[in-house]
Design a protein with these regions (language model features):
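A short, basic/flexible loop-to-alpha-helix module at the beginning of a structural domain
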Residues: 6-24, 48
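Glycine-rich active-site loop/strand segments that organize a redox cofactor
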Residues: 6-14, 55, 59-125
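N-terminal Rossmann-like FAD-binding beta1-loop-alpha1 element of flavoenzymes
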Residues: 22-57
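A conserved short coil-to-beta-strand element within the FAD-binding core of flavoproteins
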Residues: 141-159
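A structural motif corresponding to the C-terminal end of an alpha-helix
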Residues: 131-140
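Alpha-helix termini
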Residues: 17-18, 44-53, 153-154, 167
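Short hydrophobic core segments
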Residues: 28-30, 145, 161, 170-184
Length: 184
């Protein structure tokens, strides 16, 4: 899969002042659960990031998106308001709100008409997976970060992320890093 920037999928910039010819991302997220998924969506929708040619990548050790698969028990409900989704508090008009998910899946009316106003954990998991599919250009699955090392170059602080991937070890460089690896 190609490296992605906000707005479309193109390779990150290479800089001649780098320690290596590898691309430098403006942001790399470690883990791709709800926290970094929400950040990815916010950056994807950011006009400022788009104007700056902001380059980002998210690294997830699992081979595909999954939110607490062992806790998706029949009848288990989400414990928070669905308004605390990936985007509503930041931008209620976002295409990535829970209610837009229900609308695009043809289930909004059914959800509104049911007695229970809190989604099931299975429904919430489906929403998160739907959003993750929309952000697929920014994610590298089966990439486990094994080390993060700050490096200096020409007075600029960068972070070298060492990754274990199915094809072997790989280094990546970023100006900023978010770590949201979830519970064990």
């Amino acid at each position: 899969m190609e490296d992605a920037k906000v707005g479309d999928a193109v390779p990150a910039r290479s800089h001649s002042t780098m320690l290596s010819p590898l691309p430098v991302y403006d942001h790399v997220g470690v883990g791709f659960g709800p926290a970094n998924l929400g950040l990815c969506i916010a950056l994807h929708e950011s006009q400022e990031a788009r104007a700056r040619d902001f380059q980002m990548c998210f690294l997830e050790k699992e081979p595909q998106f999954a939110w607490h698969p062992s806790l998706l028990l029949p009848g288990a409900q989400l414990q928070v308001s669905p308004m605390k989704d990936l985007a509503t508090m930041r931008d209620p008009t976002s295409a990535y709100t829970f209610f837009n998910f229900l609308h695009t899946e043809g289930r909004l009316m059914q959800y509104i008409n049911r007695e229970e106003k809190v989604p099931s954990r299975r429904e919430w998991s489906a929403y998160l997976a739907w959003a993750a599919r929309h952000m697929a250009a920014y994610v590298r699955y089966a990439h486990e970060v094994t080390d993060i090392v700050p490096v200096q170059r020409d007075g600029q602080c960068l972070y070298r992320l060492q990754c274990a991937t199915p094809s072997g070890a790989r280094d990546m460089y970023a100006r900023n890093v978010s770590i949201a690896v979830g519970g064990a």
